[in-house]
Amino acid sequence: MAKKKAFTPLFYLSFIVFLPWWISFSFKKCLESWITNWWNTGQSEIFLNDIQEKSILEKFIELEEFVFLDEMIKEYSETHPQEFRIGIHKETIQFIKIQNEGHIHTILHFSTNLICFVILSGYSIWGNENLVILNSWSREFLYNLSDTVKVFSILLLTDLCIGFHSPHGWELMIGSIYQDFGFGYNDQILSGLVSTFPVILDTILKYWIFRYLNRVSPSLVVIYHSMND
């Protein structure tokens, strides 16, 4: 009976961890062909935000300048104007294909993320009993740890998330999430999120240490400040 109680929260925890990945992988395989066919046949208008439209226009201008320079080097611009127009046409078609693939992947990622969120939300509501068991199991596991191990875990987590080297990790994670939902890459927005989000987490952590840990385990706070200093 005790083994069954211990197995239930572990199974539920592994289910929560691996379920989003499995759902995302499955729906991507199922929806990719349908979204590709819908975009290439039924989509008559391209919906872009201002950042994406500006980025595509800049890339197209760079492409045109690159082809023009390449033809000038080959001395085709004066002697073979027809080849120059054909080269522009081919490169433009290739550029449009790349942009279409980008839009298809954006729609695919957004759809799978939305489906994962809905399924996990429904499972967390319907599996409330398992969530309570997981919560009680987590509390019991944490309470059985020594104060030194708890403080070490807190310091390790804070250094990973809000340490001096953490902005690089936050930049990669926020950038991938930002583009995964269909937003164009923007250095100003990304820099703003990277510079403010860790600060907010640091403030929340310090408030939690001051209010919760100081009330539950004052010795833990003393050890934390000693190791932190």
Swiss-Prot record:
Known function: Contributes to K(+)/H(+) antiport activity by supporting proton efflux to control proton extrusion and homeostasis in chloroplasts in a light-dependent manner to modulate photosynthesis. Prevents excessive induction of non-photochemical quenching (NPQ) under continuous-light conditions. Indirectly promotes efficient inorganic carbon uptake into chloroplasts.
InterPro entries (alphabetical): CemA
Places the protein is found: Plastid, Chloroplast inner membrane
Molecular function GO labels: antiporter activity; proton transmembrane transporter activity
GO biological process: potassium ion transport
Encoding gene per record: cemA
Transmembrane segments: 7-27, 114-134, 189-209
Family assignment from sequence similarity: Belongs to the CemA family.
Catalyzed reactions: K(+)(in) + H(+)(out) = K(+)(out) + H(+)(in)
Cellular-component GO terms for this entry: chloroplast inner membrane
Name of the protein this chain belongs to: Potassium/proton antiporter CemA
Keyword Transmembrane: yes
The keyword ATP-binding belongs to this UniProt entry's keyword annotation: no
UniProt topology in membrane: Multi-pass membrane protein
HAMAP family the record matches: CemA_PxcA
Principal subcellular localization: plastid
One of the Pfam families matching this protein, by short name: CemA
Entry keywords, A to Z: Antiport, Chloroplast, Hydrogen ion transport, Ion transport, Membrane, Plastid, Plastid inner membrane, Potassium, Potassium transport, Transmembrane, Transmembrane helix, Transport
